């Protein structure tokens, strides 16, 4: 086992204000503990939430902030009480790096619903030090919140599964929507949505992609394997699809109407919200009453579910569709993501970007 230094200086790319612009930043990692692992970051996916946080869309951002919560790296040191991992293991770190371990969600192993969870960035750890994410050379993480990347899964492919992949896998499992033959829809074809198509198809579902235009039809059906494509602005097609779906996985991260989609659900159908939306959504109650339909939500997934989806993707031969970029391109990547100009997930090659070298003259804390 490697020995742990109490503190260490590392380099990340941080936003310093609500412009969301990232630049090199040198900071001190939190003190390490006996159950901590030190992870050299190899790759980190870019999620739409990174934009929300970096630009303070949710009104709770603290700066400087190093984003990134789809982290894949190599264990380089372990604490004396670490039992799950060893030096050289390739591991993943997701959205959460701490929880209370005492509440009902924690005891049920769905720690993502713990009211005292600690986010992997833009939060404060138990020692009072800010948490910083995976757009950095190194992270220190408690072993409970680390997952081993299975053999057969490339690290850059694994990164989006730590958020986008488990975000669609978790509600399908939690709401009993894993039975082959179900008819489901994925609303929105971005980073989360494209994994939704792949995961649902691998479960044996008939999958419809719903989008606002026809421009993604060929991608959805020819490349991702969707069974049908529905344009939400096509009133005739929407009417023809009424009462046809067991579920809708709604990945749209901006305000949108719900009523057109509720009409597509069968009796007892579920509309599952996954997008982080800061404005109220509205519907009239008969839309759910006259069909015993449910509007519900789901938030990422547990550590156990994340490990499950990683293995599920290996077993089913699933990969995420990614564009790998260097850290120096991260601001352009964030801009493109905000314009929905990516198919379908950016992944930053952190280890290959020499972030330590480019930060020689960077400001520090």
From Swiss-Prot:
| Highest rank taxon of the organism | Eukaryota
InterPro entries for the chain: ADH-like_C, ADH-like_N, ADH_Zn_CS, CAD-like, GroES-like_sf, NAD(P)-bd_dom_sf, PKS_ER
Pathway listed for it is: Aromatic compound metabolism; phenylpropanoid biosynthesis
Q: What does this protein do?
A: Involved in lignin biosynthesis. Catalyzes the final step specific for the production of lignin monomers. Catalyzes the NADPH-dependent reduction of coniferaldehyde, 5-hydroxyconiferaldehyde, sinapaldehyde, 4-coumaraldehyde and caffeyl aldehyde to their respective alcohols.
How does this protein assemble? Homodimer.
Q: Where does Zn(2+) 1 bind?
A: 47, 69-70, 163
Q: Which organism is it from?
A: Saccharum officinarum
Q: Which GO terms describe its molecular function?
A: cinnamyl-alcohol dehydrogenase activity; coniferyl-alcohol dehydrogenase activity; zinc ion binding
Reported cofactor(s): Zn(2+)
Query: According to the UniProt record, what class of enzyme is this?
Result: oxidoreductase
Q: EC annotation?
A: 1.1.1.195
- Catalysed reaction equations from the record: (E)-cinnamyl alcohol + NADP(+) = (E)-cinnamaldehyde + NADPH + H(+); (E)-coniferol + NADP(+) = (E)-coniferaldehyde + NADPH + H(+); (E)-sinapyl alcohol + NADP(+) = (E)-sinapaldehyde + NADPH + H(+); (E)-4-coumaroyl alcohol + NADP(+) = (E)-4-coumaraldehyde + NADPH + H(+)
Similarity remark: Belongs to the zinc-containing alcohol dehydrogenase family.
Q: Where does NADP(+) bind?
A: 49, 167, 188-193, 211-216, 251, 275, 298-300
- Report whether NADP shows up as a keyword of the record: yes
Q: Name one GO biological process term.
A: lignin biosynthetic process
The UniProt annotation places Zn(2+) 2 binding at 100, 103, 106, 114
Q: Which UniProt keywords apply?
A: Lignin biosynthesis, Metal-binding, NADP, Oxidoreductase, Zinc
Q: Output this protein's name.
A: Probable cinnamyl alcohol dehydrogenase
The lineage, from the top, is: Eukaryota, Viridiplantae, Streptophyta, Embryophyta, Tracheophyta
């Amino acid at each position: 086992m490697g020995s742990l230094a109490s503190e260490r200086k590392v380099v990340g790319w941080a936003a310093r204000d609500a412009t969301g612009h990232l630049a090199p930043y040198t900071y001190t990692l939190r003190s390490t503990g006996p159950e901590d692992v030190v992870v050299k970051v190899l790759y980190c996916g870019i999620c739409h939430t990174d934009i929300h946080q970096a630009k303070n869309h949710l009104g709770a951002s603290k700066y400087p902030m190093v984003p990134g919560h789809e982290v894949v790296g190599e264990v380089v040191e372990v604490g004396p009480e670490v039992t799950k991992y060893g030096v050289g293991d390739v591991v993943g770190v997701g959205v959460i790096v701490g929880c209370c371990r005492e509440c009902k969600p924690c005891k049920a192993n769905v720690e993502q619903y713990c009211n005292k969870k600690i986010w992997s960035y833009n939060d404060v750890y138990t020692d009072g030090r800010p948490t910083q994410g995976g757009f950095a050379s190194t992270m220190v993480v408690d072993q409970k919140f680390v997952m081993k990347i299975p053999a057969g899964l490339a690290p850059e492919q694994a990164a989006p599964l730590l958020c986008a992949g488990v975000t669609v896998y978790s509600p399908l499992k939690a709401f009993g929507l894993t039975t082959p033959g179900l008819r489901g829809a994925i609303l929105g074809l971005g980073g989360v949505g494209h994994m939704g198509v792949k995961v649902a198809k691998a479960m044996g579902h008939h999958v419809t992609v719903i989008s606002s235009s026809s421009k993604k039809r060929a991608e959805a059906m020819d490349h991702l394997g969707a069974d049908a494509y529905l344009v939400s602005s096509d009133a005739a097609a929407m009417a023809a699809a009424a009462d046809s779906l067991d579920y809708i996985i709604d990945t749209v991260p901006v305000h949108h109407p719900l009523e057109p989609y509720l009409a597509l659900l069968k009796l007892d159908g579920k509309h599952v919200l996954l997008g982080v939306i800061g404005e109220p959504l509205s519907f009239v109650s008969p839309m759910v009453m006259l069909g015993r339909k449910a509007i519900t939500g789901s938030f990422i997934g547990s550590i156990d579910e994340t490990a499950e989806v990683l293995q599920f993707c290996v077993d089913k031969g699933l990969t995420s569709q990614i564009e790998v970029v260097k850290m120096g391109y991260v601001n352009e990547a964030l801009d493109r993501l905000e314009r929905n100009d990516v198919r379908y997930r950016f992944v930053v090659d952190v280890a290959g970007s020499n972030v330590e070298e480019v930060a020689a003259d960077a400001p520090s804390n």
